[in-house]
Regions:
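Hydrophobic alpha-helical segments and their helix-loop junctions in multi-pass secondary transporters
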Residues: 27-32, 136-143, 147-152, 156-164, ...
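Selective recognition of specific alpha-helical transmembrane segments in multi-pass small-molecule
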Residues: 129-140, 191-202, 229-242, 257-289, ...
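Loop-to-transmembrane helix boundary motifs in multi-pass membrane proteins
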Residues: 118-125, 136, 332, 339-378, ...
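Helix-loop-helix module between adjacent transmembrane segments
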Residues: 81-173, 236-237, 322-332, 351-352
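Membrane-interface "cap" regions at the ends of multi-pass membrane proteins
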Residues: 2-66, 173-179, 195, 505-506
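Membrane-interface helix-loop-helix modules in multi-pass membrane proteins
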Residues: 40-107, 247-292, 305-325
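Hydrophobic, small-residue-rich membrane helices and short re-entrant helix-turn-helix hairpins
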Residues: 108-116, 177-186, 243-276, 291-302, ...
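Terminal cytosolic tails of multi-pass membrane transporters
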Residues: 31-35, 429-523
């Protein structure tokens, strides 16, 4: 590989970070007079194309350079395409459900606010905990990925890069809040699209495919793992996207429903193309003889073995793209954590500098864990399993037909789904320890058995079983209590219809102060 020199590598990396720092702080200076609400969100202000670039930048991260090629080397064309489609298509969910949630909760800017108004404070805190943990895990995975990738590309120690990235994004995000993240993501998203095109052309010109290796690899054939992924990945990624506050912040920031639909549609197509191209590098690395190499290397480095056949300038372009991807993703996680913590834990009443300080403090354990982090893909899967047990029972509340569905059922269902995974693993493997390891997806998705598949079936199915059992328990308790006290049994009574004055047919973009509704019923 045309590996840049020590001096060139440092110059490319730190000049890129410096450019983003200057850009971010310059924008923050222009926004220095913004009010607290604008720091946390930007409801009803953004048009379609900035939204599209933001969804692209927020959905990507440097980890895609390892995870998608790795899946391609393990499952071939089938698994790679399933992964790309499963990652891109869930963006459309925000176009479909975003308008519904905004009409029900126009003053919100994260999903947890809708959960508070629909299911009560305890359910909101439960989802908030899951959201913050998910963002924490994603921050770890992003730092771990950028550290590993910089080492692979340049031979440099990844730790200083991880620290500099934390410092840069923390400075401009703490100064400007969500708007900074939105504007920098627009720039970074544009850069990434351009750099992807350049890299694709370079690979097409410089890499030679060996026809014999194409047939020998077996990548054009379907596999058992590939068919398992056809279920696992859509469930995992679809549900996990609900935990990512950066997507909800951008959903609420759209000026109109039409802008939102155009934005997510463009982002979906762009993400599908980008992720397919990145994943294809794993196939091309194998078919060109660059991977697995001698001695054989992990599939997660397939993309970087391919770079050995490319000139130095391409590696420099990839390095800039990697830093841009990682910075865009990381500042999105930070701004999402600030907005979520402020809204969920403090009801936006605490001084914003206190929230900023908490986010800065969280950076220390993030860096410490990222240094020792396992596979980036495994971190994603742990978060996916948690969301697969929580989100399905949560979504029932979007329908007015399930007005009797309460927060008690949501929490019991979420915990019960994880417990069901443990029970399944214990029975399937014949060991409680193995059942616990299945909760951490320690064997990944490619162990050759049905453990991971069963876990992602057990999580949503178990959550519904436990949730409906909780519903029966709650209704029984409330019925018995009503008989004992002489009070009417109202648990199944439909809620009073909102007056015409309260109904909002369209999402308001005016600057009026909207009074937050009270919490919904938990029990």
């Amino acid at each position: 590989m045309g590996q840049p020199s020590f001096e060139a590598s440092n110059a490319i990396i730190y000049l890129t970070y410096g450019a983003f720092l200057v850009l971010g702080t310059a924008i923050a200076w222009k926004l220095r007079s913004q009010v607290k609400t604008d720091f946390l969100s930007s409801n009803g202000t953004q048009t379609a194309w900035p939204l599209a670039l933001n969804f692209i930048a927020s959905a990507l991260g440097s980890g895609v350079l390892t995870t998608y090629p790795e899946v391609a080397t393990l499952t071939g064309v089938q698994g790679m395409l399933i992964y790309a489609f499963s990652s891109a298509l869930p963006m459309l969910i925000f176009g479909a459900l975003g308008p519904i949630i905004r009409r029900q909760c126009p003053e919100g800017f994260v999903l947890t606010e809708w959960v508070r108004q629909r299911y009560g404070t305890l359910a909101m805190l439960w989802l908030s905990f899951m959201t913050l943990v998910t963002l924490f895990l994603y921050m770890i995975s992003e730092l771990s990925a950028i550290g590993q990738i910089v080492t692979l590309l340049t031979g440099l120690d990844g730790l200083p890069v991880m620290i500099v990235q934390c410092v840069v994004t923390t400075i401009y995000t703490s100064l400007g809040g969500f708007k900074i993240s939105f504007l920098t993501d627009t720039v970074q998203g544009s850069m990434v699209v351009g750099l992807i095109i350049m890299g694709t052309i370079a690979v097409g010109v410089n890499v030679k495919i060996q026809p014999g290796l194409v047939e020998e690899s077996g990548y054009l054939e379907a596999s058992l793992v590939g068919w398992q992924l056809l279920y696992i990945l859509p469930v995992a990624i679809f549900t996990n996207d609900f935990f990512l506050s950066q997507f909800w912040l951008r959903t609420f920031s759209s000026k109109t429903d039409k802008d939102l639909w155009i934005g997510v549609s463009v982002a979906t197509v762009a993400l599908l193309c980008i992720l397919t191209l990145v994943g294809s590098s794993g196939l091309i690395a194998t078919w060109s003889g660059a991977w697995p190499g001698d001695p054989p290397q992990l599939g997660s480095v397939a993309f970087f073995t391919l770079l050995e056949q490319l000139p130095n300038w391409v590696v420099g372009v990839i390095l800039v793209m990697t830093v841009s991807l990682s910075t865009a993703a990381f500042d999105s996680f930070q701004s999402a954590m600030v907005s979520s913590a402020s809204n969920d834990l403090f009801r936006n009443k605490i001084n914003i500098w206190f929230i900023r300080a908490l986010v800065v403090l969280i950076i220390f354990p993030v860096v410490a864990i990222a240094i020792k982090a396992p596979s980036v893909l495994q971190i994603y899967l742990i978060s996916d399993l948690v969301s697969a047990s929580t989100v399905p029972v949560l979504l029932l509340g979007l329908s007015s037909r399930f007005y009797w569905w309460r927060g008690f059922e949501v929490i019991v269902g979420g915990v019960g789904g994880l417990l069901t995974v443990f029970i399944f693993g214990t029975i399937y493997y014949g060991s409680a320890q193995a059942g616990g390891e299945l909760l951490l997806v320690q064997q990944g998705l490619y162990s050759g058995d049905w453990g991971a598949f069963g876990a992602f079936v057990a999580a949503p199915v178990g959550s519904f079983i436990w949730a409906f059992a909780a519903l029966g328990l709650r209704l029984t308790y409330q019925f018995v209590r009503s008989k004992m006290t002489g009070h009417p049994f109202t648990a199944l009574d439909p809620p009073a219809r909102a007056s015409a004055h309260d109904e909002e047919p369209e999402y308001s973009t005016q600057n009026e102060v909207v009074t937050t509704k009270g919490p919904g019923k938990f029990f």
